[in-house]
């Protein structure tokens, strides 16, 4: 009987260790995915500011109000 108890405790302990290792790896993967999402959103924000700056420059060159040029660019980007 004592042998069965020890075996059962050993199996449960190893299962618990295995489970905690899997959960840790899962958390690490989620953190990596979150970092990738953050990097992608930063890139999108950077591209949007570049487009906005180009739109402002184009508006100044064409003597149009900057808001009208930005509106046209926003519509063009939104259609894609």
UniProtKB/Swiss-Prot annotation:
Q: Which InterPro entries match?
A: Frog_antimicrobial_propeptide
**Proregion residues excised on maturation:** 23-43, 79-80
User: Where does the protein principally reside?
Assistant: secreted
- List keywords of the entry alphabetically: Amidation, Amphibian defense peptide, Antibiotic, Antimicrobial, Cleavage on pair of basic residues, Secreted, Signal
- State the residue spans of region: Disordered: 24-45
GO biological processes: defense response to bacterium
Which protein, by its recorded name, is this? Answer: Dermaseptin-A5
Q: Could you tell me what this protein does?
A: Possesses a potent antimicrobial activity against Gram-positive and Gram-negative bacteria. Probably acts by disturbing membrane functions with its amphipathic structure.
Show the GO cellular component annotation of the record. Answer: extracellular region
Q: Name one Pfam family in it.
A: FSAP_sig_propep
Residues with the modification Valine amide, per the entry, are 77
Tissue expression, as annotated, is: Expressed by the skin glands.
Which protein family is named in the record? Belongs to the frog skin active peptide (FSAP) family. Dermaseptin subfamily.
